[in-house]
UniProtKB/Swiss-Prot annotation:
Gene3D superfamilies: Metal-dependent hydrolases (3.20.20.140)
The keyword Transmembrane is annotated on this UniProt entry: no
The enzyme's E.C. designation: 3.1.3.15
Name listed for the protein in its UniProt record: Probable histidinol-phosphatase
Alphabetical UniProt keywords: Amino-acid biosynthesis, Histidine biosynthesis, Hydrolase
Class of enzymatic activity (EC top level): hydrolase
Annotated NCBIfam families: hisJ_fam (TIGR01856), PRK07328.1 (NF005596)
Molecular-function GO terms, alphabetical: histidinol-phosphatase activity
PANTHER family: HISTIDINOL PHOSPHATASE-RELATED (PTHR21039), HISTIDINOL-PHOSPHATASE (PTHR21039:SF0)
Coiled coil start-end: none
Gene: hisK
Catalytic activity: L-histidinol phosphate + H2O = L-histidinol + phosphate
GO terms for biological process, alphabetical: L-histidine biosynthetic process
Length: 260
């Protein structure tokens, strides 16, 4: 897999990942990758999702840890530094402030909450049985469109995340409209192989959405969403084939600029 970069991975600072940044970098080398970009969950206001992300005061520690890995692996592995940010209405100013604190390489914009419901958290999966799936996906993709229009992010994370536990979208109309917005804003999509490790057993986005995105000229950024070193580069050969089979392309980011 020479030449490939894993641009979605986490560190223990988020509270739900294991392994040191150095171990992730070594795993990338062992997998034959040429680079990786750390994108740990960014700090948010204290009332928001606090157990699942670093605190604001830990941000310098995160930066220092990755810079140490950059130095150690220089000449062997292209190590970049980014964030996975959340789009949640009302927090945009806070996110903008954090994004202005450092020269990040890549910022993913993800939606993990519908109101107060963390819909990708296994602890709250029973809530799906109380929801109308059509309305759920309508509301979710409205937030994705908000993320795309916000100007805060470089790519949209795990596009069809609500399918994680097998609750599939009954109508693609909202997803396709969201793709129109993503394309119009010039953003990329996180091709997130973690879906192959989840109950849905399907990468994010689904194959039909990968094709639809490629038809709209939206590029993909490969990401394993690794929360442990053994997940780095997970099924990247399959990901590349799926993207290329529909005429899509992959990119990476450096200093918030898209690179082929």
């Amino acid at each position: 897999m020479t030449g490939l970069c894993d641009s979605h991975l986490h560190t223990p600072l988020c509270g739900h990942a294991t392994g040191t940044p150095r171990e992730y970098a070594q795993a990338a080398l062992d997998a034959g990758l040429s680079g990786l970009c750390f994108t740990d969950h960014m700090p948010m206001p204290r009332w928001y999702d606090a157990p699942w992300r670093m605190k604001l005061e830990q941000l310098p520690e995160y930066i220092a840890e990755i810079q140490a890995v950059q130095q150690e692996f220089a000449g062997r592995l292209d190590v970049r530094l980014g964030l996975e940010a959340d789009f949640h209405p009302g927090t945009e100013k806070f996110v903008e402030k954090v994004l202005g604190m450092f020269d990040w390489d890549y910022v993913i914009g993800s939606v993990h909450y519908l109101g107060a419901w963390g819909f990708d958290n296994p602890e709250f999966v029973a809530e799906y049985e109380e929801r109308d799936l059509g309305g759920l996906y309508r509301d979710y993709y409205a937030l994705v469109e908000g993320a795309a229009r916000s100007g805060l992010f470089d790519a949209i994370g795990h596009l069809d995340l609500p399918k994680k536990f097998g609750h599939l979208d009954p109508d693609p109309v909202y997803a396709l409209h969201a793709l129109d917005v993503v394309a119009g804003q010039g953003l990329a999509l996180d091709f997130n192989t973690a879906g192959w490790r989840k109950p849905v057993a399907e990468a994010y986005p689904a194959p039909d959405l990968v094709r639809a995105a490629a038809e709209r000229g939206i590029p993909f950024v490969l990401g394993s969403d690794a929360h442990q070193p053994g997940e780095v580069g997970f099924r990247f050969a399959d990901a590349v084939k799926e993207i290329r089979d529909v005429g899509g392309r992959t990119v990476t980011f450096r200093h918030r600029k898209m690179q082929p």
